[in-house]
Amino acid sequence: MEDKNILYGPEPFHPLADGTAGEQMFYALSRYADISGCIALTNAHTKENVLYEEFLKLSCRLAESFKKYGLKQNDTIAVCSENGLQFFLPLIASLYLGIIAAPVSDKYIERELIHSLGIVKPRIIFCSKNTFQKVLNVKSKLKYVETIIILDLNEDLGGYQCLNNFISQNSDINLDVKKFKPNSFNRDDQVALVMFSSGTTGVSKGVMLTHKNIVARFSHCKDPTFGNAINPTTAILTVIPFHHGFGMTTTLGYFTCGFRVALMHTFEEKLFLQSLQDYKVESTLLVPTLMAFFPKSALVEKYDLSHLKEIASGGAPLSKEIGEMVKKRFKLNFVRQGYGLTETTSAVLITPDTDVRPGSTGKIVPFHAVKVVDPTTGKILGPNETGELYFKGDMIMKSYYNNEEATKAIINKDGWLRSGDIAYYDNDGHFYIVDRLKSLIKYKGYQVAPAEIEGILLQHPYIVDAGVTGIPDEAAGELPAAGVVVQTGKYLNEQIVQNFVSSQVSTAKWLRGGVKFLDEIPKGSTGKIDRKVLRQMFEKHKSKL
């Protein structure tokens, strides 16, 4: 008998469609290619556009080029590039053929690249002109890499082909896309992508996502409750890195809906707001650290953002306070939150637009189940009891690439995946993230969630960004400490900040480890606070027990 405290997703608005992720992508692109002038991608920095018609033809020609080059099903390619118009072409061509694609961060240093590429051993690395030199340096140390292809140049560089020349040399410019046919294979087993975990709890691991995992995400994207109503030409603006799971699977889903994806490779406040206005953007993707910026920005009122209907937040927990401030500033009905891991393909908890609860990260999505488990006893907990989240369903990864030990540590024999995150759900099944299990600060036996204190700090009118960590202390175990960024022209001191927090929380959450005033909070490439680096800034602290 199933435990009554296991929660299941609702019936899907769209059942899982037949076919592989490549077949579904091909048929979707074909449909939108027939709409005259339908734009697939816009580079917000350069204003360049790519039409769905062109996007489809290039992806098919690249797939044919892969075949002529000699790539076969289960061979691997890698992509190391910032967000760009060409980023998804090798990925979609790979989906067509059953080739495995491995996106890696353009921010990786050579040591990190060597580690990640060494897991999947790609035959080809696609890069940008910005990452070319770094990738070239790495290639000399990786004998399995046969060649490098530069995505965003129109001419070859250093003896290596640009994407346009590779396609021209290996495929017919007059290719009839209506005669192109993606390969068919077992979507349940065939790996589509290897995404790399963030490595915040150790070295990064290769997360194997199957075609079925991706197809389930496509279904959610078309769901009007958990995703979007299908409306070609709807404009989306994203600054989320495409190599990140949130940016990757969400954007792939957008293509199946025929949306116009306006991309940014770096966040620039004025350009972001200008793009929202110019492209009449209806939905945008942000991480919470960027969300915190807008409630206090003087620029927001200078732009016409009347088309904006939704801001979607993911990648890290969003505090209730910031969510409410952003909603009010942009005059939105709600801010859509999502919660997921690289290992769950995409968000498995999403705010349903029919039932919004401030501070909640959402409800369990179709095709999935969730339970909250006591980390100590293993007991399945009920409503309003805090424990670790476990998930099961169609978007759970196949395994870690060539790492059976790590796979067994995160997925149990019954197929439940441990999230490593602490949360609870209310009586109506809305979930609330407390913090990472490993991020919790242990103060005199009490567990303190950094995200809670960060949410309070960001309520202060002079604080534009904040990060909280625990620093070692012999007497207490760990002391909560905060780094804060103060608004230009405003003044705060340590005592003011400590008093502001202590007036709103229990004594275990006081900032006894101190406060540091920083120019910026240390963060990773996806905007998550790097608590390890932040902790190092507090090595010389004074206990204030």
Swiss-Prot record:
Its EC number is 1.13.12.7. A motif (Microbody targeting signal) lies at residues 543-545. Keywords: ATP-binding, Luminescence, Magnesium, Metal-binding, Monooxygenase, Nucleotide-binding, Oxidoreductase, Peroxisome, Photoprotein. It is an enzyme of class 1 (oxidoreductase). It catalyses: firefly D-luciferin + ATP + O2 = firefly oxyluciferin + hnu + AMP + CO2 + diphosphate. Its cofactor is Mg(2+). GO terms for biological process: bioluminescence. SUPFAM superfamilies: Acetyl-CoA synthetase-like (SSF56801). This is Luciferin 4-monooxygenase.
